[in-house]
Amino acid sequence: LPDVDAVIVPIGGGGLISGVAFAIKSLRPEVKIYGVQAAGAPSMEHAFHDHKYETLDSAVTFADGIAVKTPGETTFDMVSQYVDEIVTVSEDEIAAAILALMENQKLVAEGAGATPVAAALFGKLPLAGKKTVCLISGGNIDVNILSRVITRGLVMSGRKTNLMIALEDKPGQL
């Protein structure tokens, strides 16, 4: 990909982004490397911005592939050296990205794998005019979670709604 300007990579413990960032920066240092974590499990994002290795009290996200409380020590050093920025995305943004990938690309991605697309779709990074790669790292999503994610994405996009009407429990109310 000689004309790529930016690469967005999901982050859990940091192994994938460390390898990707090192390889790309070794060949083309001008390419921007961006990492993405779920807002409910931002261990590397906190460490990156605080410039120190740290552990979270909890990591809560349906993107279980990146639900990591403590980033790797070695990977933290690599990320600090080779990654340009790390952002977080919400559960709703991840759900919308999964739905967009299904509808537009016919691709089933797990929550962790969809975080780069979520960051791009929701303007979390300065990507205007850049040729960007979103690394979609996995499709291992439970069908029950997928069903809830689809519903959530449809509600977010205004294509599905719930209507509840309170009725008295007596004949003739319907």
Residue map of PLM features:
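Active-site-adjacent helical/loop segments in soluble small-molecule enzymes
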Residues: 5, 72-130
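Short amphipathic alpha-helix segments
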Residues: 170-174
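Glycine-rich phosphate/pyrophosphate-binding loop at beta-loop-alpha junctions
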Residues: 1-81, 122-168
